[in-house]
Curated annotation (Swiss-Prot):
GO terms under biological process: translation
CDD domains found in the cross-reference section: uS7_Bacteria (cd14869)
Quaternary context: Part of the 30S ribosomal subunit. Contacts proteins S9 and S11.
Source species: Wolbachia sp. subsp. Drosophila simulans (strain wRi)
Annotated Pfam families: Ribosomal_S7
Family affiliation: Belongs to the universal ribosomal protein uS7 family.
One term under GO cellular component: small ribosomal subunit
Protein name: Small ribosomal subunit protein uS7
Protein encoded by which gene: rpsG
Role of this protein: One of the primary rRNA binding proteins, it binds directly to 16S rRNA where it nucleates assembly of the head domain of the 30S subunit. Is located at the subunit interface close to the decoding center, probably blocks exit of the E-site tRNA.
UniProt-listed InterPro entries: Ribosomal_uS7 (IPR000235), Ribosomal_uS7_bac/org-type (IPR005717), Ribosomal_uS7_CS (IPR020606), Ribosomal_uS7_dom (IPR023798), Ribosomal_uS7_dom_sf (IPR036823)
UniProt keywords, alphabetically: Ribonucleoprotein, Ribosomal protein, RNA-binding, rRNA-binding, tRNA-binding
Lineage: Bacteria, Pseudomonadati, Pseudomonadota, Alphaproteobacteria, Rickettsiales
GO MF term set: rRNA binding; structural constituent of ribosome; tRNA binding
Length: 159
């Protein structure tokens, strides 16, 4: 474990179209091989398709979807006396949002490989699924809650 100062968090600038830092974080999550303009195009196209389907603003749809997938509790491994316990702990807000963005990206990637549709279509459907509290990303969030509920007996072993 490092004993130096903690690394400073870099400030993320808001995206150009909506002026949202959350959306820029998602663009950085989706981006591959440094191709930010391609990632922006994919996300903006998916949000415009979602706008047409629902009739609300793209940013509000996205923020609600991320909010629905954001976990508030997770389990962490804790070794005590030769036994390893899964201890439920609260998730920091920054980590919770990062997990939600990663899960949406992961579910989109899995759907794209499975169905053969374009990334834009899969991302749009995954955002709408998260908005309506269903889909792959929401399922991952529910699994976190189930694990925490199953290991509630070990909550007194908190860090």
């Amino acid at each position: 474990m490092a004993r130096r100062n903690k690394a400073k968090k870099r400030e993320i600038s808001p995206d150009s179209r909506y002026g949202s830092v959350l959306l820029m974080r998602f663009i950085n999550t989706i981006m591959k091989c440094g191709k930010k303009s391609t990632a922006e195009k994919i996300i903006y196209d998916a949000l415009s398709l979602a706008e047409k389907k629902i009739g609300e603003g793209g940013l509000s749809i996205f923020e609600t979807a991320v909010g629905n997938v954001t976990p508030s509790i997770e389990v962490r491994s804790r070794r005590i006396g030769g036994a390893t316990y899964q201890v439920p702990v609260e998730v920091r807000q920054d980590r919770a949002v990062s997990l939600a963005l990663r899960w949406i990206a992961k579910a989109t990637s899995a759907a794209r490989k499975k169905s053969g549709k374009t990334t834009v279509d899969c991302l749009q459907s995954e955002i709408l699924d998260a908005y309506n509290k269903r889909g792959g990303a929401f399922k991952m969030c529910e699994e976190k809650y189930k694990m925490a509920e199953a290991n509630k007996a070990f909550s007194h072993l908190r860090f």
